[in-house]
């Protein structure tokens, strides 16, 4: 029963992760525009955010977002503003984009890690999703609250690891495409505009979205 439950969870998780959304689209655009290292750093940041969301859900804090329209809206609009800021910054700053052949400095990679982390944490729909999704695969009549929380964390860890694997594959594939396109200056400039517009669009989409 447990093995079947985990198998179903993995299958359902992969279906969710592969579905187009802000996280995988962000990794895709970073990989195309700025190369493998930047995209991977962004992916690690986002998956770290998933672990934090799991922890918050396990201790019950995410339930506040599910119940409070005010708390949900505050975080949602903060996330939308942050995405909009990243998009405008990409559109205005040519320094944001370097050739994928150049190795980004470590400080730059840390910056993109924290951008990915912040972007994920400021999306309240992730927290609400975890509250709705993970309990479906919990063991009924768990012996203790502590055991239930540990299982919640284990499922969240599996989801984060699956996300990291998928996002890493997207980052590597996108960086190969970006490396070829960036050799043409016109394509490189188009990639900058594409990334900026995608981020602004994701911000607008988040701002206009509901809880579902």
Residue ranges and their predicted role:
Residues 2-73, 132-160, 178:
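Juxtamembrane transmembrane-helix termini in multi-pass membrane transport proteins
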Residues 7, 11, 106-118, 150-157, ...:
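Alpha-helical membrane-protein architecture signal
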Residues 14-17, 120-121, 160-168:
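Residue-level hotspots within the lipid-embedded alpha helices of multi-pass solute transporters
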Residues 22-25, 84, 128-131, 164, ...:
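Residues that mark transmembrane-helix kinks and helix-interface sites
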Residues 37-112, 173, 204:
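Membrane helix-loop-helix hairpins that form the core translocation module of multi-pass transporters
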Residues 67-96, 160-170, 178-212:
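Selective transmembrane alpha-helices of multi-pass membrane proteins
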Residues 122-127:
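Selected transmembrane alpha-helices and immediately adjacent juxtamembrane segments
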